[in-house]
């Protein structure tokens, strides 16, 4: 018995040791599980709190709270919607009651909480005061998104020189009903004024006279810009910008998404600010609304390293005449000051001095050119030139416009679509990926988001419905008469050819270079020159 008992003792001890080891292992496992679950639980809690308002505030509530905090908006409002820091101070009635939100409740989300109504009232004390002038024949579907997008950026005044579709009563009455918009119609009286204007009687623009299509438009734009300078000065504007309705300002590099902020930071000795242009690069042939469907753009030469630009030139050009389909010399904004004059549609000048200009390193003009397949035929229909290589040189300044006009005038619909896909649409994913990585192409979503939010908020429909209900026919007709008769100064457009000889004989020789036309970006033949620089 003793012997048997002597051999059992180690067995009991071993069993006890095994049980203790198992308990220790179980404790360690539970501890590890607890340590794993704890941070996960905290992360989930933080996410829930942020989602319910514990983190970044809801845009609508941020807009409301900014009105009760620091005048001009709070830091929170800067963080959510840059450039809109003055919303609360703009209109005293903006936040009178919570029911004001219903004005924008056209969608399930508070997609555009910046203003309480479509009028976009702007505090007259805000500086700088910016105006845009344009010459257009477009419809409301293009003008309204373009205009209200720039209102979001801080533009307060628009001088619209309208003709064609834009001058029809159903469209012009809507435009005239919008605060800050001046509509100028192309009438006989306007043309007579412009025939007596200073720049019509000077030589620097004369090489563009009496030519059709793009040349005629270029002269009209310049004469309209001359008139707009006078209107801008009378309205107390600080800056004036000439922009087409297929172009949007992209204020990259500013502390806020705001053209006003961008220009506020410009040194006081600068007279002109140049925005290099980016060109839309469509990825489909069925685009209907470029402003909300196009997000890819080709960057300007000025915003690219020279070796990248010329190294990728062939892939970026895709057998087209130039790097860009159309112009590449950007647009500019000028300080409204004495002796200011246009220097073509892309630049400004001064009669008494050489303007001090700067070129922005990040901000750009987004040019939505040939972004719809229908742009081929619409441009063709506006021009009566013959579709020959010689005659198109008389009508168009840029090579791609000439080629597009010939195709649109001579090809079948199927051939036009095939040509459009080959020369305009970016369908090759590998090429796109390569150029995006190299920085030639870039994605820009901000304008798309802003305009889509405007559309969802009901801003555009509010403008149209308000104009329809509030403008009587009598008031509308009188407003047209007032718009055309109250302009006391400046210019009008193209005098008839009968007066050509008289006009030339009386023309003043101005010691200045010819007006700056739309120019293509540098080509490969200039690569050596730019590399040496």
Swiss-Prot record:
Chain ranges of the GT92 domain: 137-377
Location within or outside the cell: Secreted, Cell wall; Cytoplasm; Cell membrane
Gene Ontology, cellular component aspect: cytoplasm; endosome; extracellular region; Golgi apparatus; Golgi trans cisterna; plant-type cell wall; plasma membrane; trans-Golgi network
The enzyme's E.C. designation: 2.4.1.-
Keyword S-adenosyl-L-methionine in annotation: no
GO biological process: abscisic acid-activated signaling pathway; cell differentiation; cell division; cellular response to light stimulus; cellulose biosynthetic process; cellulose microfibril organization; developmental growth involved in morphogenesis; maintenance of root meristem identity
Region called Disordered, residue ranges: 1-22, 86-108, 485-504, 512-533
InterPro entries (UniProt xref): Glyco_transf_92, KOBITO1-like
Entry keyword annotation includes Secreted: yes
Glycosylation sites: 24, 201, 470, 484
Pfam families: Glyco_transf_92
The organism's place on the tree of life at top rank: Eukaryota
Other facts noted in the record for this chain: 'Kobito' means 'dwarf' in Japanese.
Function: Involved in the coordination between cell elongation and cellulose synthesis by promoting the expression of genes involved in cell elongation and cellulose synthesis. Acts as a regulator of plasmodesmatal permeability. Mediates abscisic acid (ABA) and sugar responses essential for growth (e.g. seed germination, stomatal regulation and ABA-regulated gene expression). Required for normal organogenesis by promoting cell elongation, regulating cell differentiation in vascular tissues and maintaining root meristem identity.
Name of the protein described by the UniProt record: Glycosyltransferase-like KOBITO 1
Organism, scientific name: Arabidopsis thaliana
